[in-house]
Curated annotation (Swiss-Prot):
Knockout or disruption consequences: Mice do not respond to persistent pain. Postsynaptic surface expression of NMDA receptors and NMDA receptor-mediated synaptic function are reduced in dorsal horn neurons of the spinal cord.
Phosphoserine modified-residue sites: 28, 65, 307, 328, 360, 365, 406, 414, 528, 530, 553
Gene assigned in the entry: Dlg2
Organism, as annotated: Mus musculus (Mouse)
Full protein name: Disks large homolog 2
Annotated Gene Ontology cellular component terms: axon cytoplasm; axon initial segment; cell junction; cytoplasm; glutamatergic synapse; juxtaparanode region of axon; neuromuscular junction; nucleus
CDD domains reported for this sequence: GMPK, PDZ1_Dlg1-2-4-like, PDZ2_Dlg1-2-4-like, PDZ3_Dlg1-2-4-like, SH3_DLG2
Start and end residues of each SH3 domain: 536-606
Tissues where this protein is expressed: Brain. Highest levels of isoform 1 in cortex, olfactory bulb, thalamus, hypothalamus, striatum and hippocampus. Highest level of isoform 2 in olfactory bulb. Reduced levels in cortex and hippocampus. Highest level of isoform 4 in spinal cord. Low levels of isoform 4, isoform 6, and isoform 7 in superior cervical ganglion.
Lipidated residue numbers (S-palmitoyl cysteine): 5, 7
Top-level taxon of origin: Eukaryota
Record PTM text: Palmitoylation of isoform 1 and isoform 2 is not required for targeting to postsynaptic density.
Length: 852
């Protein structure tokens, strides 16, 4: 058996995407002037956008309170432009803005990509915003957007500089940072119908997006991401990257999951009819410009929104609407890097909603409200109130989080005890509220409204509402479990009968508070149970499972979702059931804090589910999606190690350590050989091989120490193996081969990544040797992607490959640094590169000896 190991020159690993085509270089970037005239439309040339989706970014994060106001947007003097350029016969329009941010302890709160040495979009040397970090200065200010191009940092021109120069300018900008940015004007779409005839290559295009897998933040739509050469779409010529798929034959693709969209497209006949939304540039003149709510209080612009039968918005106007739930139909390669940690955005609920809050730069429609309609329509339980709104802002990187006064329709209940009807559309975060109650017939109450969720955006529910029924199911005497089940199984459109009962809820809340205090006091005095913050102020753990807060009906308050491998800072572990925690990012703790299930709760629920599996399923039965039959979908993606049924993976205590070597890399699972080969091929100066040992005699053309380390005797190598000097060894043709700890250390201490083609057992052996590897497990989603990525596989071979991967996860799951999944080899490859970059150090999280 041969044991290959690869090494790489240590640098700051950058993020890459394959480039399909480049556009011509843009030589007409305007220079900002200090002369500011009245607002004017500025037309600036833009090149064709390439397929580059992701290069590398520099992350700066900050938490600012309060924010300092910055000047009004700067409009470039159009006299400085001689002519109005065109792109393929189309005028491309930009707007320019000056944004002032105050740097906090952690930075500015955004990521960048691009530069003259590594263009982000085609040949454009600009520095582009690829990510707005929630809770940072940029997110709190609310004006900086993904895909903005930074032209100047304070007085430093960064319009045509290298990436490192831009990073340096941002680092040295001081505590008050003025950014001059350029962005495209808003985009609408035109709906067209396309008829395609399937050929040998099928329809010939790739898609991304869907509920729970958003391609554009806040948007559940399905987008075209690639046109395949020689396919039906390319031959037809009308479908393009960035188009939004609305319908396939008679099936709507609105609010469907990615898997549902794929299934609909696969189950089509030879002739396929597509309804497609194509982006169309529009020019917003001043009368329709978004209000500047950052600097001043704007008069209300009331929008009259009606809910059509298909759930879409209808505007009482002849102007085409802008979908409120979307930023823009720009393809993802214009929105910057993929963000695997970004939480899903909520879907807007528009039913029974008379007026919305004023438009913001993210959500704008120049439509006036028909006030006569409002006055004439009978709504017996509501009256209009123009009150300041501080809770309706969606917490996204494009939202305006500077809580300036704005006008919204506020619901007031004229008769406190009268039931009312509320209709919500489920989003990716569920319905956006929590419930309590259900004991001793006390009723089910709304205890928490998720900011930006469907309930919040509808304005129809509030804390203290009693839920009387859900889709006709009476909940007045229901238990908590019955109410949770009714809400979870209610479908996409949920009709709720609610009744505002503030006094009943206050009595219930007081009782819960007393019970919780008693439990906390008992827990603190008992000396047993989970680790407590009075015993240990700072507790860090690594999540060993996926947790989706939107699927956990038992949450006592706002939850915190996380993925396998995430580092969590547990702030309060004094409760046996729930812990308070923050997710730890590369820049420190994130601003978002929420509750997570305790170790005890996770393990108890998993054991209960394992008993159900043993009762309902045949031993060892795992379906083609990797799911164990009988498991409930409650947000806990926990795992049990094979052969160790008492060992349930929940949280692993970790400690932060600085390392002075470059971490080895072990990739396990299907396609690992192709990933290793691609890393070496694309980065030959960063990834290579280390030298294995063997007892085989040296051949004439071989050099000791270059081709192999030739061991003098078999006895000596067997002795070294017994003394744990090898991470893995085996026998081939009566000769021993192996990879020694010293060989790996030799590579690591010289600043090179060492990719090891070894089994999962080697991970633990490297950890014992104080060489903590980056262990990446490629987990197949199902048989179909395996067969798609390797056309030579038969279904039987794919099934065996899939089963081996599942067993591999069961055996070594506790040692993985990260688990990656993807539908294509390119997607998996890019995720692996991202993990390697993020986990390279010099500060890493390693297992601690602490016991939870």
């Amino acid at each position: 058996m041969f044991f290959a190991c690869y090494c790489a020159l240590r640098t700051n690993v950058k993020k890459y995407r394959y480039q399909d085509e480049d556009g011509p270089h843009d030589h007409s970037l305007p220079r900002l002037t200090h002369e500011v005239r009245g607002p004017e439309l500025v037309h600036v040339s833009e090149k064709n956008l390439s397929q580059i989706e992701n290069v590398h970014g520099y992350v700066l994060q900050s938490h600012i309170s309060p924010l300092k106001a910055s000047p009004a947007p700067i409009i470039v003097n159009t006299d400085t432009l001689d002519t109005i350029p065109y792109v393929n016969g189309t005028e491309i329009e930009y707007e320019f803005e000056e944004i002032t941010l105050e740097r906090g302890n952690s930075g500015l709160g955004f990521s960048i990509a691009g530069g003259t040495d590594n263009p982000h979009i085609g040949d454009d040397p600009g520095i582009f915003i690829t990510k707005i970090i929630p809770g940072g200065a940029a997110a709190e200010d609310g004006r900086l957007r993904v895909n903005d191009c930074i032209l100047r940092v304070n007085e430093v021109d960064v319009s045509e500089v290298s990436h490192s120069k831009a990073v340096e300018a941002l680092k040295e900008a001081g505590s008050i940072v003025r950014l001059y940015v350029r962005r495209r004007r808003p985009i609408l779409e035109t709906v067209v119908e396309i008829k395609l005839f399937k050929g040998p290559k099928g329809l010939g295009f790739s898609i991304a997006g869907g509920v729970g897998n958003q391609h554009i933040p806040g948007d559940n739509s399905i987008y075209v991401t690639k046109i395949i050469d020689g396919g039906a779409a390319q031959k037809d010529g009308r479908l393009q990257v960035g188009d939004r798929l609305l319908m396939v034959n008679n099936y709507s693709l609105e609010e469907v999951t990615h898997e549902e969209a794929v299934a609909i497209l696969k189950n089509t006949s030879d002739v396929v009819y597509l309804k497609v939304g194509k982006p169309t540039t529009i020019y917003m003149t001043d009368p329709y410009g978004p209000p500047d709510i950052t600097h001043s209080y704007s008069p209300p612009m009331e929008n009259h929104l009606l809910s059509g039968n298909n759930g879409t918005l209808e505007y009482k106007t002849s102007l085409p609407p802008i979908s409120p739930g979307r930023y823009s139909p720009i393809p993802k390669h214009m929105l910057g890097e993929d963000d695997y940690t970004r939480p899903p955005e909520p879907v807007y609920s528009t039913v029974n909603k008379l007026c919305d809050k004023p438009a913001s730069p993210r959500h704008y429609s120049p439509v006036e409200c028909d006030k006569s309609f409002l006055l004439s329509t009978p709504y017996p339980h509501y009256h209009l109130g123009l009150l300041p709104d501080s809770d309706m802002t969606s917490h996204s990187q494009h939202s305006t989080a500077t809580r300036q006064p704005s006008v919204t329709l506020q619901r007031a209940i004229s008769l406190e005890g009268e039931p009312r009807k509320v209709v919500l559309h489920k989003g990716s975060t569920g319905l956006g509220f929590n419930i309590v109650g259900g004991e001793d017939g006390e009723g089910i109450f709304v205890s928490f409204i998720l900011a930006g969720g469907p309930a919040d955006l509808s304005g129809e529910l509030q804390r203290g509402d009693q839920i009387l029924s859900v889709n006709g199911i009476d909940l007045r005497g229901a238990s908590h479990e019955q109410a949770a089940a009714a809400l979870k199984g209610a479908g996409q459109t949920v009709t709720i009968i609610a009744q505002y009962q503030p006094e009943d809820y206050a009595r219930f809340e007081a009782k819960i508070h007393d019970l919780r205090e008693q439990m906390m006091n008992h827990s603190m005095s008992s000396g047993s149970g989970s680790l407590r913050t009075n015993q240990k102020r700072s507790l860090y753990v690594r999540a060993m499972f996926d947790y989706d807060k939107s699927k956990d009906s038992g949450l006592p308050s706002q939850g915190l979702s996380f993925k396998y491998g995430d580092i969590l800072h547990v702030i309060n572990a004094s409760d046996d059931e729930w812990w308070q925690a923050r997710r730890v990012t590369l820049d420190g703790d994130s601003e978002e804090m929420g509750v997570i299930p305790s170790k005890r709760r996770v393990e108890r629920k998993e054991r209960a589910r394992l008993k159900t599996v043993k009762f309902n399923a045949k031993p060892g039965v795992i379906d083609s999606k990797g799911d164990i039959p009988g498991l409930g979908d409650d947000g806990y993606g926990t795992k049990t190690l094979r052969g160790q049924e008492d060992l349930i993976l929940s949280y692993e205590p970790v400690t932060r350590q600085e390392i002075n070597y470059t971490r080895p890399v072990i990739i396990l699972g299907p396609m690992k050989d192709r990933i290793n080969d691609d890393l070496i091929s694309e980065f030959p100066d960063k990834f290579g091989s280390c030298v294995p040992h063997t007892t085989r005699p040296k051949r004439d053309y071989e050099v000791d120490g270059r081709d192999y380390h030739f061991v003098i005797s078999r006895e000596q190598m067997e002795k070294d193996i017994q003394e744990h000097k090898f991470i893995e060894a085996g026998q081939y043709n009566d000769n021993l081969y192996g990879t020694s700890v010293q060989s790996v250390r030799f590579v690591a201490e010289r600043g090179k990544h060492c990719i090891l083609d070894v089994s999962g057992n080697a991970i633990k052996r490297l950890q014992v040797a104080q060489l903590y590897p980056i262990a990446i497990f490629i987990k197949p989603k199902s048989l179909e992607p395996l067969m798609e990525m390797n056309k030579r596989l038969t279904e039987e071979q794919a099934k065996k490959t899939y089963d081996r991967a599942i067993k591999l996860e069961q055996e070594f799951g506790e040692y993985f640094t990260a688990i990656v999944q993807g539908d294509t080899l390119e997607d998996i490859y890019n995720q692996c590169k991202l993990v390697i970059e993020e986990q390279s150090g010099p500060f890493i999280w390693i297992p601690s000896k602490e016991k939870l």
